[in-house]
Each structure stands twice: as C-alpha cells, then as structure tokens.
Swiss-Prot record:
Keyword flag Acyltransferase: no
Main location: cytoplasm
GO biological-process terms attached to the record: negative regulation of epidermal growth factor receptor signaling pathway; negative regulation of epidermal growth factor-activated receptor activity
Chain positions of all zinc fingers (FYVE-type): 835-895
Compositional bias annotation for Basic and acidic residues: 542-552, 605-615, 659-678
Positions annotated to bind Zn(2+) 1: C841, C844, C865, C868
Cross-referenced Pfam families: FYVE
Subunit structure: Interacts with TRIM3.
Protein name: Lateral signaling target protein 2 homolog
GO molecular function: phosphatidylinositol-3-phosphate binding; zinc ion binding
Protein purpose: Negative regulator of epidermal growth factor receptor (EGFR) signaling. Acts by promoting EGFR degradation in endosomes when not monoubiquitinated.
Species the sequence originates in: Mus musculus (Mouse)
Keywords: Cytoplasm, Endosome, Isopeptide bond, Membrane, Metal-binding, Phosphoprotein, Ubl conjugation, Zinc, Zinc-finger
Tissue-level expression: Enriched in brain (at protein level).
Length: 905
C-alpha cells in the first residue's frame, strides 16, 4: 500500500533527464513486454512472438545500459576490471553484448544447455543463477530509490551495484570464452608483435616509394591485400628475428602464419636467393592491386651478382644460352607449362598450403639445361637432374621412370642371377645420327618406341649422374615397395612419353618412359658400377649374357632407383649434392672414389656367363676399367645406362663423384679427337656391342692416368662434415632449379600472394583488428612542438578574415563593444539576405533542396545550411540575450570572446 502511495506521489516524470528516472521507465517497459510475452502462445502467433522477443531483447539492452551509466556515476572507482575484453573478437564487441549475456544467463539459470557446450554450460549454471538474482536485487533497489529521491545514491544501492558488476564481469568472460576462442596473454602479445611488423613494413614501403601517405590516409582498400603481402617479405628477410622467425618453435608463432610454417620456410629460402634488384621487383609487383604481368627480364640467366664462376671457362661458340635454341629441349626442361600451372592457381585458394608448397619446387624433375650447375660438364650444356620427383597419388605414378634425354626401348626381364648382381644386355643397335650428328643435342620424343632404336645424345656425364644420384642413397622416409622381379613387358606394351605424361598430369619429357604396370616386390638390389676407361685396369670384369638380337634385358634397378630416391623432401637431395661437392673438392678431378661394398658389378653385353665378385676380395673395390683395344667408334656412337640401387647404407661414391657431371679440362670433342679409341660405342654390327659403358674421360680431361682415392664410409662422413657448403653455392643451387629470374619472381609472387590472401578468409577478424590498429598508427602525423602549434593557430586566426564579411572589416575592438553593451547602446542587427537571392549555402556551396533548408545567421545575416549554422550564441551587441542561430564563422571569430580578442590583435 505504501509503495502504491509513494508511486502515486513521487513517480518521476518521463521527461526527467536524471538516470534513476530513465531507469524507472525503462524497467517499466521491460516488465510490460515480459508480461505480454509470458501470456502469448508462440505456436498460434509465431510472428507476434518473434516481434516481442526482439522487443524484449531491446528493452534488456536499454536497462543494462542505464545501469552501467549509474555505476559509472555511483561507483566509478569500484568497477570490476574488464581488461579481458580486449581479447574478444571484434565482431562480438558491440553494444548489444550485455543484453545477449543477460539472455544467456537466464537461459542457463532455467536449465538450458548451450549447443555443443555441455560441460561449459554445467560449469556456468551456478554463476548464471547468482547473476540473475543479483540483477533482480539491483533492479528492485534502483526502482525503489527512483520513487524516493532521484538525487541520492544510498549505501545499499552502492553495495548491490558492486556485487552485480563483479558477477557480470565474471560471467562475461566465462560465457564469451565458451562461445568463441579467446586469445591467451601470450597469443595477444604475439599479435601485437605482428602489428609492429606491419607498421615497420608500411614505413619501409613509404621509404621505398611502394606506397604513399595519401593511400594510408584515405584507407585505400587495396592496402588490405598489399600490406600483408609486403609484411611476409619483410618478416622473412628484413626483420628475420620478428614474429615470422622460422627458427623458433612453431607454437611460438602467430596463429595467422602457423598453418603456413613449412611453406614460409621455402619462401624464405627463395627470398634469400634473390638479389636486391629482384627483391625490389618482387615487392613492387606485390603492391599492384590490378592483375598485371610481371616485367619480363631480358636475361634468363642468373644475375651478375650470382653468376657462376664457371661461365667463363665455356667455349665462346657454345655458351649456355645456346642450349635454349632447341624449342623441344626448352619444352622438356622448362618450368613453365601453362595448363597445369593454371590448374594449380585455380585450386590455390582452397588448398593453399599443399598447392603453393608444390609451386616452390620445380614442376619437372628435369632442370633447364641453360641454368644448371652441372652445365659445365659438357660443351653442350647437358646435365641430368639432381633428383627425380614422384607423385604419390597412385602405384602407376610410382612406377614411372624417366631416362633423361635418351631415347631407348628396352625389354625388361628377370635377372639371371638372384644375388646382388643385376645385368643389362643389349643386342643389335641402330644409329640414328650420321656424319657429325653426335655434336648436336638429340632431343626427341618418339611416338612409337622400337626395340632397335638407340639414340646417343652425348650425355655420358648425364648417365653417370643419373645412375649415381638415383641409386646411390635411399631415403628412409619413402618406404615404398620395390617393384623389381618377375615383370616383363614387350615393346608393344611400352608407353610413350606423351601418353604417360598426359595420364599422370606431368610434363612431356623428351625421354623414354619405362612403365611397369605390374611387378612384384624384390628384396635384393645392387650397386651399378660404371666403367672408367684409362690406363689402369681392374681384374674384376663381370659380364652379362645377351638373350638375342632383338631382345633386351632391362636392369630392374632402374625402377628401384626411382622408388628409393627421396621425393618427400628437398633436403635429402640437397644434402646429397653438398656431400658430392665437398668430396670432389677433397679428392680432386682425377680421383675415383670406390664404395666399400662387395656387391659391385659391371653389366656388359656379351656371350659370357655373368661372373660373381668373390666375397673374399677386399671391401674397397676399384672401379673396373676396360681396355680400349676391343672398342670401335662409329660416327654416331650410342650408349645406354646401367642403373642400380644400394640395398644397404653403402654408397657408391664413385658414381656420386661422377654424377655431378663436372668437366675439369678440355671439351669433349677435342678429347675425342686426341684419343678416338677411348670413346664409348655401342656397335650396331656386332651382336656383342658394349652396353652401359659409362666412362668418365671427360671428367679426367687431359690427364692420362686415373688415381684412386679409396675411402670407407667413416672417412667419407668425416670428409663431408669437415667441408661446409658456402652460401653462394646454396643460392646457386636454389636458383638453378628455376628457368630464370622472372620465373623465380613469378613463383614467389604466386605463393606470397596466396598466403597473404588466405589470411583474409581464415583470419578475417584478427587481420581486420591488425589493419585497424595499423591505420590508426600510420595515419597519425608527427606532432609538432607547442610553439609551432601556437604560431600556426595565430596565423590561422589572423588569416581567417573574410573579404565579404562586414564584421571582419570593422575596426571596433571588443572592449569598445563591451562598453556599448553596458551603456545599453545596441546596434541594429544586420540585414538578412533575401531567400530568393541565394540558392546555395554561403559556406559549403551546397544547393538548397526540399530537405536542405535555408537558415539565416543572426550575426551576419547571410544564408547557410543547417550544418554550417548549427551553433547558438547570445548577441549582446544586437540586444539578443538568449542564444540564437549563428554561422560557424561568426561563432568562432565574432561571438566567442577568446577569438574576438584574437582578431583584434
């Protein structure tokens, strides 16, 4: 009864601006909507129910906002800390968050469960019940105080507000943490480091002229893509110790770049191989918002700063660029093949990590002949790949073997001896080239591969390299089965390079593709030994048996080499190449390293039965060499490859040494002229033509003797560990995998853009927050000194006089105006400009419309729009004591005493 009388007597007015009065009516409206919602049947009137729920949520927001204002006024020093709100995602930090939290607390208190958050819901239910009770106490206390005294805050009300504030802050953190991921302090600190990196990147871009200050001040939309791209480059190269430091743990990286850790490592290696000019070219291309083509460089070789030292030793008439004249060779060895590249780019947005990682490696196992470190091995600039790439999609692709630049068809058969020796025999062979064709690069891809077709491309060094690098070591990370024994394919079943390349999605290589559709597993494999012709001979000369004129046995180690080459990571092949380089430096060009492996055989065509190597012989076996007396040299000599694989940890170091394809002496044609008896041949007239005679005369140069440098595995490891690889060699090795400078920049552009643009999709909220902070920092101009500020303000005020303003032209001081006002001597107000005489705002020149109306300034009488005449001030000089409408100019310079005194200076 007393509350009813108090409500009737002390009920506040609706127009009362005091907070308790506003709360009273907001709470009344909330109770009315809640009562109507309780009495409504939502099944019969779903639309009405939806409308009331929306209205109820709005009323809750209004009540909580007023309570928050009361707490700011009542207990400003006792508020619960809410620093955790900075960790919330930006999309949930809005004005309606408090109402959503209230609604969630009521649902949890009533027994509801958050979907997929059962454990969190059960843990928060006691807190939600306590929060709802505290909120009801606060509402009752404030409503009671609004009926008593609107200007007084009792201690009871203060205590209720303190308790509610603490509970609401605790529930806010718990509820939001359960609904959305909240950053830990460490993650928040890392994100701040990313913000600093972005700011430093923009500073650097401004210094180099990539961006302009106007673009930042205008919030250019293209910067949302440009800045993250440049930040990746700066974070990997310029500020390598920052948040993109890849040498620390992956867990310590920002979650923005953590999924791209492996890809960023590859990008960093390629960026470090760039010159300064190439780096600037890449950064300029990353700043372009439109899809423009990268500038094509005229040179396809490495820049002068990274030019290899061996280029000067090549014959002038046979430079590296000459090898690019053959269009089919360029097609076979180039990295550019548009169809597959376009397909890669189209899938990049959805599979950024895998696809862009593959783009960083050459799409073909064959490198461009004009850009390989092994190009100096032959005047023709030919070299074989450092390693073969395998696609692990199917068994078919794992059983594809490419023989580099050699067109050969061989009928594979089971080896005669099941031990550690593999055999390769050859029947009659036909010579394709006649009368000097041996001096050309014979690169062809035959549509039909015949048994009799043997082509010599003068790639003896390539054969040694391919045999050694493919079969020297096996990578433990690739445990695929060896498809070796018991398969035999006729010439009709062999597929051409075009067919298999088309089916497997790879690039057409001008090489014979040996494909084995079905082959069982073999447990044994051996090391292939290449013959080294010279004056020194070896007592070991095992031979293989030829089965016929037109039937050829393929050593099954060819497939074994491919299956055991490391294709899952690039570091294995790189380390292998580094070991070969260090070994060559130690032993010299005239040394031959033999493996400490007794199972070394030379597969050679002939009628004799294969001879086994006596196991009682020493482990260090010198490479077998053959007398040159039994050889013949046709006009266009042909050769084949003897490939094998090591079944154990032993490494055929001789093959590895020769596999680099280094030429340490005179060119091959001159060597052939001096000693024609030492040239490798495969006689087409003799059924006992030599097969797999891979000699290294061009490796020895003019040296007539072959030295031997026998090392066991332990000494080899010591030698390789003692000689580190120089950074220049590493950069050259990386650059040699790409067709040229333009191709390297293009690959980096694609991958960096893919990673940066992927951030827009995966981490839109974090990136938006980072860019928002970035623009706030970078758009701020450097502040000047206070004296300079004062000078600028004074100059502005003095120059603020308008020529058409009568008040600016008068010379009466403010003191004289004040004296006239005290004496009651008022001036006549200025004449108003007629409405029909002005169709535009005097200040902003905006045309007047039905919506934009005309307003007269009471101080100067001119016509302005509402925006330019929004101020009100008394005009004592005209007798106007109450505030009247004045324009902005008059308000700033003629009405306010401070500015009026300044204008009188």
């Amino acid at each position: 009864m007393m509350n009813r009388f108090r409500k009737w007597l002390y009920k506040p007015k609706r127009s009362d601006p005091q907070l308790l009065a506003q709360f009273y009516y907001a709470d009344e409206e909330l109770n009315q909507v809640a009562a109507e919602l309780d009495s409504l049947d939502g099944r019969k009137e779903p639309q009405r129910c939806t409308l009331l729920v929306s209205q109820f949520r709005s009323c809750q927001d209004n009540v909580l906002n007023i309570i928050n204002q009361i707490m700011e006024e009542c207990i400003p020093q006792d508020r619960a800390p809410r620093d955790f709100c900075v960790k919330f995602p930006e999309e949930i930090r809005h004005d309606n968050l408090a109402g959503q939290l209230w609604f969630g607390a009521e649902c949890l208190a009533a027994g509801s469960i958050i979907m997929n958050r059962e454990l969190e819901s059960m843990a928060m239910r006691p807190l939600a019940k306590e929060l709802t009770r505290s909120l009801e106490d606060v509402r009752g206390t404030l409503r009671d105080q609004a009926l008593r005294d609107l200007n007084t805050y009792t201690e009871k009300m203060r205590e209720a507000l303190r308790r509610f504030d603490v509970l609401f802050a605790e529930f806010e953190l718990s509820y939001v943490s359960a609904m959305v991921p909240v950053k830990s302090p460490r993650e928040y600190y890392v994100q701040q480091e990313v913000i600093v990196l972005f700011c430093e990147t923009v500073e650097r871009a401004l210094d180099f002229g990539y961006l302009t200050q106007d673009m930042i001040d205008d919030y250019e939309p293209a910067l949302m893509f440009t800045i993250p791209r440049l930040a990746i480059v700066c974070g990997l190269v310029v500020y390598a110790d920052g948040p993109l430091n890849l040498d620390r743990k992956v867990e310590d990286m920002s979650e923005l770049f953590r999924p791209f850790h492996t890809l960023l490592r590859k990008i960093r290696d390629l960026l470090q191989a760039l010159t300064e000019e190439e780096l600037h070219t890449l950064e300029r291309s990353l700043c372009v918002s439109q899809d423009v083509e990268l500038p094509i460089r005229a040179d396809t070789q490495a820049p002068s700063a990274l030019a290899p030292t061996f280029s000067a030793s090549l014959p002038p008439e046979e430079t590296l660029s000459a090898s690019a004249n053959n269009p089919e060779a360029e097609l076979a060895c180039s990295m550019q093949y548009d169809d597959q590249e376009l397909e890669e780019l189209s899938r990049m947005v959805h599979r950024a990590g895998d696809e862009m990682s593959s783009l960083l490696s050459p799409p073909s196992a064959c490198q461009s002949p004009a850009h390989r470190p092994g190009s100096e091995a032959s005047p023709r600039g030919e070299a074989s790949p450092a390693r073969a790439r395998l696609k692990s999609g199917s068994d078919e692709e794992e059983r594809v073997f490419f023989m580099d630049d050699v067109e050969v068809t061989e009928s594979p058969a089971r080896p005669e001896s099941p031990g550690n020796t593999f055999e390769l025999t050859q029947g009659n062979a036909q010579q394709r080239g006649q009368d000097g064709q041996s001096g050309e690069v014979g690169v062809e891809a035959p549509a039909l591969v015949k048994e009799e077709d043997w082509s010599n491309n003068n790639v003896e060094g390539d054969k040694i390299k391919l045999a050694s690098l493919m079969g020297s070591t096996s990578c433990s990370c690739l445990d695929s089965q060896l498809y070796l024994d018991g398969w035999e394919v006729s010439a009709e079943d062999a597929e051409t390079a075009e067919m298999i390349a088309h089916r497997t999605g790879g690039m057409k290589l001008s090489a014979t593709v040996i494909f084995n559709p079905k082959s069982p597993t073999s447990q044994d494999s051996a090391v292939a030994a290449q013959e080294a012709p010279g004056h020194g001979t070896s007592p070991l000369e095992p031979r293989a048996e030829g089965t016929g004129d037109n039937s050829h046995k393929l050593s099954t180690t060819a497939t074994n080499c491919l299956l055991h080459s490391c294709v899952c990571c690039g570091s294995c092949g790189d380390s292998r190449d580094d070991a070969v380089e260090r070994l060559r430096e130690k032993c010299g060009p005239g040394s031959v390293i033999s493996a400490s492996n007794p199972s070394v055989s030379l597969a050679k065509g002939g009628d004799k039965e294969p001879e086994r190597i006596d196991e009682a012989q020493p482990s260090d076996v010198t490479l077998p060499a053959e007398d040159a007396s039994n050889r013949q040299e046709p006009k266009a000599p042909a050769s084949s490859k003897c490939l094998a694989h090591t079944s154990g940890p032993q490494v055929d170091t001789a093959s590895r040494l020769q596999g680099e394809g280094e030429v340490k002496g005179q060119p091959e044609p001159e060597a052939r002229k001096q000693d024609p008896e030492k040239s490798p041949v495969v006689s087409g007239d003799s059924p006992r033509g030599d097969v797999a005679q891979t000699e290294h005369q061009h490796l020895l140069g003019s040296s007539s003797t072959v030295g031997s440098c026998s090392l066991d595995n332990t000494r080899l490891d010591v030698a390789t560990a003692a000689m580190p690889v120089t950074p220049m060699a590493t950069r050259e090795k990386i650059r040699s995998r790409f067709h040229g400078s333009h191709d390297l920049i293009h690959r980096l552009f694609v991958c960096i853009s893919g990673v940066a643009d992927q951030l827009q999709t995966n981490y839109a909220s974090d990136l938006r927050s980072i860019l928002k902070t970035l623009f706030e920092v970078m758009a701020t101009k450097p502040e000047t000194d206070d004296k300079e500020k004062l000078k600028k303000v004074t100059q502005t005020l003095r120059s603020a006089a308008l020529e058409d303003c009568a008040l600016c032209q008068e010379t009466v001081s403010s003191s004289e105006l004040a004296a006239k006002t005290r004496d009651g001597d008022f001036e006549d107000p200025p004449e108003w400009v007629p409405d029909e005489a002005c169709g535009f705002c005097t200040s902003c020149k905006a045309p007047f419309t039905v919506i934009r109306r005309k307003h007269h300034c009471r101080s100067c009488g001119k016509i302005f729009c509402s925006r330019c005449s929004s101020h009100s001030a008394p005009l004592p000089r005209y007798g106007q004591v109450k505030p009247v409408r004045v324009c902005t100019h008059c308000y700033m310079f003629h009405v306010t005493p401070f500015y009026s005194d300044k204008t009188g200076m």
